[in-house]
């Protein structure tokens, strides 16, 4: 539906971002897209692959919204120190792109609020990581 309206898909949840991003990447393969379009045809739809799946961090940062965030902050969060947990799904990127791009963008967005970003040694681990350590 996004493609039919000339729009990209913007996702807030990291897990949903990865699922939709991976699906979109798979649909770049002609055979997969043909198979999917055979099914979509029954619903009167077709997918051409023109829409991109973007994380909200990309949209806010790359579409020039970071300056708007700075402008809209009326009470800077100067006394707030934040440790960001990116989660592994935020690192999904197109081939050849910098996997640290979105985490850096998120840091800049947090800083735009006036808050300080502090290092966190587990910042890029999967949010499901603690479950894997339960039996230890």
Label the predicted regions:
Residues 1-136:
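Iron-sulfur cluster-binding electron-transfer modules in prokaryotic oxidoreductases
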């Amino acid at each position: 539906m996004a493609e039919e309206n000339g729009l990209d898909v913007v996702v807030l949840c990291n897990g949903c971002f990865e699922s939709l991003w991976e699906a979109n990447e798979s649909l770049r393969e002609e055979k997969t897209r043909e198979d999917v379009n055979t099914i979509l045809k029954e619903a009167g739809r077709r997918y051409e692959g023109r829409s991109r799946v973007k994380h909200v961090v990309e949209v806010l940062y790359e579409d020039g919204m970071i300056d708007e965030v700075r402008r809209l902050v009326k009470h800077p969060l100067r006394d707030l120190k934040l440790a960001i947990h990116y989660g592994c799904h935020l690192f999904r990127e197109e081939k050849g792109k910098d996997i640290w791009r979105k985490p850096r963008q998120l840091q800049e967005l947090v800083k735009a609020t006036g808050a300080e970003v502090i290092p966190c040694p587990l910042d890029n681990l999967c949010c499901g990581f603690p479950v894997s350590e339960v039996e230890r």
